[in-house]
Each structure stands twice: as structure tokens, then as C-alpha cells.
Amino acid sequence: MKPQDIVAGKSSLWIFGYGSLVWKPDFKYKRSKVGYIKGYKRRFWHGDNFHRGDDEMPGRVVTLIEEDDVCTWGVAFEVTGSQMEESLKYLNVREAVRGGYLTRAVDFFPRGTNQPPVQALVYIATPDNPIYLGPASTEEIASQIAVCKGNSGHNIEYLLRLAEFMRVSCPDVDDPHLFSIEAALLATIRPILLAA
């Protein structure tokens, strides 16, 4: 699905972020809301050879994997007017060209019981992507994250900021995949930090 197909005839658009977009959207938006989408789980299964790694040592970043009866929490950003075209151009380079993500339309459910869902655009990497890494053990993922760095910074920052977002913005939500990788990473780097 092309983003242009989603925005045709619309005056506003919601964009759902579940990885670095939750703390670093880097585009103008009217407002943002914390909430979730259904039918997807967040996994550190996608490679990153630009933002958080390189060709020799790709970092690990999140993508969404379809699964019934689960949800993924994040932030949806509403863009309006000229912000729609500007944000889609920017995100096309950031997520699609450099990250290999595809776009899909999903229902976003804002936190709170009395708010109806809104349609949102989300970027998802699939196993067809050449830099898709797929499943690995918690320890393998943490070890890879510990040593990778790209143009946007260290892969460690990506993981820790995402975990911090979940603790601060979604304190009642458990994300075992995310938090187990964070714990494994901290166990790996703690001796290095203490020795410094």
C-alpha cells in the first residue's frame, strides 16, 4: 500500500510509531496520542544497516509480526494539511528507503475507554526484506545491539529509549520481549561500565 493512497482526499492522517518514532519523530505534527494497535507484536527482528548499524554489523530494530490476540503500544501522530506530504516524504526516506519498511493501514486505539479507534499508517518490515534478520535468542539480540552503531547513534540508545518510553508512557503494559532484551543488554554492558 502506498501512503498516497491512504491520504487521497483526506485533510489529516495518523501515523503510528512503535520504535524510534515514539521518542524521535523528527517531523511536524498537530498532536500525538499514546495507544495501541491490535493483531501485532513488536519484535527486534529487523536489521538496520544505516541508522543503528552498518553493512558489516547491522543493528537490530523493531518490526511488527502479525499474531492474534496481542497488541502493540506506541504513539500515533496526527499530521494535517502540508504536514501530511512533508511527513510522508521524510518517513519514506527514513523508514522505506533506508529501512526497507512497507506501509499498512491499521486501526489505532487511543489510551482511554471513551475514544474510538482511528485509521493510522504504520511502517512494517517483512521477512522479504533483504536486511530482515528474523528471530534469535534474547542473548543473541542483546549482544548484537551492544556492539552496533549507525548514522543515528548507538543501537543501545534505541533499545533503552524504547524501554524507557514503555515504562513512562505505558506503565501498566508488560512487553516481555523488549524488557528481557533490555535486561540481557544491561547484564552484558554493566561489567564494562563498572570497569571504566
Swiss-Prot record:
InterPro entries: ChaC, GGCT-like, GGCT-like_sf. GO terms for molecular function: glutathione specific gamma-glutamylcyclotransferase activity; Notch binding. It is an enzyme of class 4 (lyase). It is found in: Cytoplasm, Cytosol; Golgi apparatus, trans-Golgi network. The active site is at E95. Substrate binds at I15, F16, G17, Y18, G19, S20. Disulfide bonds: none annotated. It comes from the Eukaryota. Keywords: Apoptosis, Cytoplasm, Golgi apparatus, Lyase, Neurogenesis, Notch signaling pathway, Unfolded protein response. The keyword Lyase applies. It catalyses: glutathione = L-cysteinylglycine + 5-oxo-L-proline. GO terms for cellular component: cytoplasm; cytosol; trans-Golgi network. One of its GO terms (biological process) is response to unfolded protein. Its EC number is 4.3.2.7. Belongs to the gamma-glutamylcyclotransferase family. ChaC subfamily. Catalyzes the cleavage of glutathione into 5-oxo-L-proline and a Cys-Gly dipeptide. Acts specifically on glutathione, but not on other gamma-glutamyl peptides. Glutathione depletion is an important factor for apoptosis initiation and execution. Acts as a pro-apoptotic component of the unfolded protein response pathway by mediating the pro-apoptotic effects of the ATF4-ATF3-DDIT3/CHOP cascade. This is Glutathione-specific gamma-glutamylcyclotransferase 1. It comes from Danio rerio. The lineage of its organism: Eukaryota, Metazoa, Chordata, Craniata, Vertebrata.
